[in-house]
Amino acid sequence: MTSINEQQVPVASPVIGEAEIDAVVQVLRSGNVVQGPEVAAFEERFAALVDGRICVAVNSGTSALHLLLLALGIGRGDEVVVPSFSFAASANAVRLTGADVVFADIEPDGFGLDPAAVEAAITPRTAAIMPVHLYGHPAAMDRLTPIAERRGLAVVEDACQAHTAALHGKPVGAFGAGGAFSFYPTKNMHAIEGGMVTTADPELARTVRLLRNQGMEQRYANEIVGANMRMTDVSAAVGRVQLGRLAAWTERRRANAAYLDDHITAPAVTVPPVAEGARHVYHQYTVRIRGDRDAAMARLTGAGIGNAVYYPTPIHRLKPYWEPDQKTGRAWDLPETDKAADEVVSLPVHPSLTEGDLERVVTAVNALGENP
């Protein structure tokens, strides 16, 4: 058990330092707190992370996905192939357009969409594939993109957890028709709240800009139906500060993950897989537990090690998706998704961890042995 003098090692540790506070105060004193010069500067700087693609800042990662799908013309009558092993926002963004979600299974040796399962899920109504770069590991874009190209489908990347992740040197958010990033406080970098759309298509970017601002480019000259999904200058100012620290934070995450990989030896625990050519940025360090996961988590918590399950219920088993499918008689056979949801546990990997913290994590995990 944790001693009275030991604090729990948290599974996540968002950073809001003096530089972020100073940046916010400067914006507040300027009087221009809504979308303005800070947002434009943040968009320009973020483009360097995605091979110079056009960036459009919005108010959340979910909005980024939603607006990107809308800008691509996806809506009622269309289908989008999505992994069920993800946060619900991936599927919610599709449903909000009026399109239908078609779930495909994940790979048995990873957490991303299985290209073979995607191929099998495609129908004449399929308009897009949405790979999710879950936990900071790139999906199999080298195999998914050719499927989309051959079938004439858009690729919409959910990169909300994967800032600076890459596959064979190409950054996520730069593969498909567009990508979506999140700046929620627990992400590898944050903007308090916010999101970013990335695309190489100027017309698509313009449509997203219209959609985020009530359909307007010029004030009161509405061109299309839109909404208020703008990022504020307050959020953008925080994002710009965090962006300057992202590289160092990411290398610390990767170093922490390497330490855990090298020192976790418990037979019941499988460390995160990394595909050949993949740059994993470890938004989460997610292991698989063989045996009684609840007992293992309780033991870790008792030892003062923060832990969490992302995500305990696959999307296809959540009420908004499960009940309609039961009414229509459609059933999803996603064995690898269900298996992962039963086995995964995320451990601390964030850049604020000390050497002592890492040693405590390893000691607690290895104490699980063969049978948690």
Model-derived regions: residue spans:
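PLP-dependent aminotransferase-like
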Residues: 70-134, 138-159, 166
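Structural detector of well-ordered beta-strand residues that form the stable sheet scaffold
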Residues: 56, 81, 102, 154-156, ...
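PLP-dependent aminotransferase class I/II
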Residues: 40-44, 52-56, 116, 128-132, ...
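Phosphate-binding glycine-rich loop
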Residues: 32-79, 92-97, 103-105, 170
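Conserved active-site segment immediately N-terminal to the catalytic lysine
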Residues: 157-191, 218-223
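N-terminal "arm"/small-domain region of PLP-dependent enzymes with the aminotransferase-like
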Residues: 1-32, 37, 348
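Short beta-strand-to-turn element immediately C-terminal to the catalytic PLP-Schiff-base lysine
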Residues: 181-182, 195-201, 240
